Amino acid sequence: DFGNIRHEGGVAFNSGKKPVKMIKRFLEYFESRDICVLDFFAGSGSTGHAVLNLNKEDGGDRKFILCTNNENGICENITYQRIKTVITGKREDGSDYSDGIPANLKYYRTDFVSKNEEYLSDTLLEHVAEMIQLEHGIKLDGRRYITVMNDDEADRLAEHWSEYPDVKALYVSKNVLFTTEQNALFKDVDIHIIPDYYFNFELREVGETW
């Protein structure tokens, strides 16, 4: 497999790729087919490639998170492109690579939020959408999956509720208190309270929670 490794994933990555077959062998040691695999030093994306292949072979529901500091653009130009190629079956130049593997792929850039913000909890809430999407495996599209961060948003949503026939779930700040009428209106929709644990450590450090 090391002799064929340069062809895997449809991207070039000298002296760094790991054989997909080898990583799949490691993953097969886990009985569960519903695990989350973290590669905190991702390079060419072999781990993600292996997870996708194994899911296709045995019908598993494994997920993966690939992390890299994007040095020299490695994440954008190598890791992301490889996983995209495996999923779509098309190389970056448009040529055929494979039949593809149906899957979802999200790319996030991380950054630091200053602890000197006057109200850190309000600032962190601006970034809560990414956390919700990662945990629940959904896309907050404002139609099927909607966030409600304050009472004014709840009022507007209720006022225009007839315009949202496809709503499946609401993700609601714990500070929002629905009225009796709103509870009746939203009764057929899954409601998830946005939990403190997303940023509990950070808020405890600055004394906004305990």
Role assignments for model-derived ranges:
Residues 18-21, 43:
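Short, glycine/acidic-rich beta->alpha junctions
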Residues 8:
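ATP-dependent phospho-/nucleotidyl transfer catalytic cores
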Residues 35-54:
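A phosphate-binding catalytic loop at a beta-strand-loop-alpha-helix junction
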Residues 1-3, 13, 20-36, 56-210:
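Accessory, often C-terminal, charged low-complexity segments
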